[in-house]
């Protein structure tokens, strides 16, 4: 079942938390609502599931207008970051709780509990209590419970935030597998761009209650529509430099960029850490720190009160405190308007 949001506005008193959000989520896809704290991603999710009520606009599931309905009227599955498992119940009872409320036949309920437990790979844990499970296993129980009643839509609010790094990676892979196997339409809320990039069919990047960009992870990384998107997507963050342009040319130290814009205007140059060459001349900087990341090293450079991040091969040797020249690779520079911060071109 697909989801449509049409000009959705959510207010808390005089504060507008969601401002004219329009979005279409295709049936059977997993999309991530991504953004910094306060961007409106969780508020959007809670409005879709009926916890918050919209000030205006519409929410449509399939061809059904569900605007303003209560959560229990929507037939959706919900997974929260705190798992919300009942500690006195077994895993079997936790998974079956929504089926009991829906008055499922006991035999059919037992069959469904085992079915979803196998789907999330916890069928050997059904007679344990939540306290006997790891964080990752508890999260799988929460997902199984959400899927038990066969929802067409699954909503997950920061479901991995309480897990350690290794478990986060494993569990997000499991969520993706489960979503593909079941074909459920899923919305995954996260502030972690790595999670969103790895799990999503599409990313919806939000800021200040509005959508900045909707696209596939690869397209958002390669083709950001503004400086905010470029800075939020990618690790480390994109490097930025303000440039004065004259006759289409911008200069930083001995590094010259041509054909920037025909207009006489100031722009912002952006380039990613992996798109930099070490050179004999170019942008001069001092090496502040060298971090070993395995196959690569991350250099933190200082240049005229600016900080640049540069990735180099592990075999490249340079000492902290030394000088270095760098050049952004041709065709890998992003030009943004200084005033609007909108994307202009690559060069």
Where do the protein language model's features map onto the residues?
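ABC ATPase nucleotide-binding domain helices that frame the ATP-binding cleft
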Residues: 42-45, 141
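ABC ATPase nucleotide-binding domains
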Residues: 30, 71-81, 85-228
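Conserved ABC transporter NBD signature motif
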Residues: 57-65
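Helix-to-loop junction immediately C-terminal to a conserved catalytic motif
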Residues: 49
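Non-catalytic connector elements of ABC transporters
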Residues: 236, 249-347
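ABC ATPase nucleotide-binding domain
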Residues: 4, 24, 60, 325-327
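The feature captures the beta-strand-to-loop junction immediately N-terminal to the Walker
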Residues: 34-36
């Amino acid at each position: 079942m697909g989801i449509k949001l049409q000009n959705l506005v959510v207010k808390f008193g005089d504060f507008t938390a969601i401002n004219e959000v329009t979005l279409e989520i295709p049936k059977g896809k997993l999309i991530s609502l991504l953004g910094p704290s306060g961007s409106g991603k969780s508020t959007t999710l809670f409005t879709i599931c009926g916890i918050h009520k919209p000030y205006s606009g519409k929410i449509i599931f399939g061809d059904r207008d569900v605007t303003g309905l209560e959560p229990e009227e929507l037939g959706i599955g919900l997974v929260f970051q705190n798992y919300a498992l009942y500690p006195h119940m077994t895993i079997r009872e936790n998974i079956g709780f929504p089926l009991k409320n829906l008055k499922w036949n006991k035999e059919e309920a037992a069959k469904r509990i085992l079915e979803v437990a196998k789907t999330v790979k916890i069928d050997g844990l059904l007679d344990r209590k939540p306290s006997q499970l790891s964080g990752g296993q508890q999260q799988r129980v929460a997902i199984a419970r959400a899927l038990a009643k066969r929802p067409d839509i699954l909503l997950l609010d920061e479901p991995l935030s309480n897990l350690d790094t290794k478990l986060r990676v494993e569990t997000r892979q499991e969520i993706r597998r489960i979503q593909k196997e079941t074909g459920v339409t899923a919305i995954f809320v996260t502030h972690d761009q790595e999670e969103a990039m790895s799990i999503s069919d599409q990313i919806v990047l939000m800021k200040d209650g509005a959508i900045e960009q909707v696209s596939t992870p690869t397209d958002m990384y390669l083709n950001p529509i503004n400086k905010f998107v470029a800075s939020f997507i990618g690790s480390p963050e994109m490097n930025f430099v303000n440039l004065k342009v004259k006759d289409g040319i911008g200069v930083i130290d001995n590094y010259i960029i041509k054909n920037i814009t025909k207009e006489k205007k100031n722009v912002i140059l952006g380039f990613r850490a992996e798109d930099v060459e070490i050179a004999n001349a170019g942008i001069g900087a001092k090496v502040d720190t060298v971090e070993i990341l395995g196959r690569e090293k991350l250099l933190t450079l200082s240049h005229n009160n600016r900080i640049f991040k540069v990735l180099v091969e592990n075999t490249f040797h340079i000492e902290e405190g030394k000088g270095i020249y760098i050049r952004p690779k041709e065709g890998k520079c992003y030009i943004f308007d200084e005033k609007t911060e909108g994307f202009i071109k690559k060069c």
